[in-house]
A protein has these predicted regions:
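Conserved N-terminal phosphate-binding loop of PLP-dependent enzymes in the Aspartate aminotransferase
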Residues: 1-172
Length: 172
């Protein structure tokens, strides 16, 4: 399994590959050596950050909290954005979410100028202290594992406000 920036929470670049004992044994048995850890990899500072980050994730139960508490809370709040007239669909797994912007709910129609609505929303969001990414007319969010319920409420309230502004702008 490959992994990357999440192992350091993005503070420093690091990536890697994890293999099972079965896989590593097959490599060692056939090749005699499992070659890894070259001079251009395994940077000590990045590895130290990864070790500390993993310790914090474990000590503060952030993965369990995301799965059992804040994730479901955010998913429920995020789903409420589907009540907005320009939101066709929301979806979320864990803390990664997307929201599709459409000119008319329950219609297969899309905005004529693809990505204008997305960028309009994104610009309103950034100007109001909310960082989200526009991918065409889909808005993507991925808040940190340490987000609180109060911050989730603020995120969704600001998203709704930005949807209102976007709707107003797109209907001019």
């Amino acid at each position: 399994m490959t992994f990357a920036k999440g192992v350091t929470s993005g503070y420093l670049p690091l990536g890697g590959v994890m293999v099972s004992e079965k896989v590593s044994s097959a490599i060692i048995d056939k090749g005699g050596e499992f070659a890894h850890g070259f001079t251009y990899s395994g940077h000590p500072a990045s590895c130290a950050v990864a070790i500390e980050n993993i310790r914090i994730l474990d000590e503060e139960n952030l993965v369990s909290r995301t799965k059992n508490e804040i994730g479901p809370y955010l998913q429920n709040k995020w789903k409420s954005l589907e009540d907005h007239p320009i939101v066709g669909e929301t979806r979320m797994v864990g803390l990664m979410g997307a929201m599709e912007l459409v000119p008319q709910k329950d219609s297969p129609e899309r905005f004529d100028d693809k990505s204008t609505a997305g960028m309009t929303f994104r610009n309103f969001a950034v100007n109001n202290g909310l960082v989200m990414r526009a991918v065409g007319d889909t808005i993507v969010t991925s808040p940190p594992l340490v987000i609180s319920e109060e911050e989730v409420d603020e995120l969704v309230e600001k998203a709704w406000m930005c949807l209102d502004h976007t709707q107003s702008e797109m209907t001019k």
